[in-house]
């Protein structure tokens, strides 16, 4: 590859591979490429939360998620949700299940930001359907034991909408 190729030239090549005309520099294809480039490749480990940041988020219990909108640039409306920590990872669930608008956006866009404990962090979102869900149920049960909403968040509808939130490298 010629090292003198500009970023624009590379974008044109990628757009051509995706089936877009080189003069079709619409915001969405470029944004999707930029977003994909910011994601770790499949099988590559995501950066972990710093222990102090994760504990501040869990303790504050004021997490708001803002997955990107369909344009891949605009953050969605911050939505307050419960969160738990299991094995150093931050998990959330959509109480109303996979039809929840924030959940749908998080799974579709795979990125956005969170606001919690006085911090704003760009993050990735990934659905979690593995065996860790039993431990996530236990973490929710322990943290929110006095809430009348506990049974809903550990029920099958919410469990099917479990998301792991990972910080993007800073």
Predicted regions and their residues:
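Bacterial N-terminal signal peptides
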Residues: 10-21
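Extracytoplasmic
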Residues: 58-60, 78, 87, 109, ...
């Amino acid at each position: 590859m010629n090292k003198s190729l500009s970023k624009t030239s590379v974008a044109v090549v990628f757009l051509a591979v995706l089936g877009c005309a080189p003069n079709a520099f619409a915001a969405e294809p470029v944004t999707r490429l930029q977003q994909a480039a910011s994601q770790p490749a499949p099988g590559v480990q995501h950066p972990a939360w710093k222990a102090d940041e994760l504990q501040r988020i869990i303790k504050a219990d004021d997490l708001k998620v803002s997955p990107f909108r369909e344009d891949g640039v605009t953050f969605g409306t911050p939505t307050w949700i419960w969160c738990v920590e299991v094995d150093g990872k931050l998990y959330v669930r959509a109480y109303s299940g996979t039809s929840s608008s924030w959940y749908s956006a998080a799974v579709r866009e795979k990125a956005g930001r969170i606001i919690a404990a006085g911090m704003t962090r760009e993050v990735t979102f990934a659905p979690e359907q593995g065996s860790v869900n039993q431990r996530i149920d236990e973490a929710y049960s322990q943290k929110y034991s006095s809430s009348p909403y506990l049974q809903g968040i550990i029920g099958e509808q919410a469990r099917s909408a479990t998301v792991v939130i990972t910080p993007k490298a800073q």
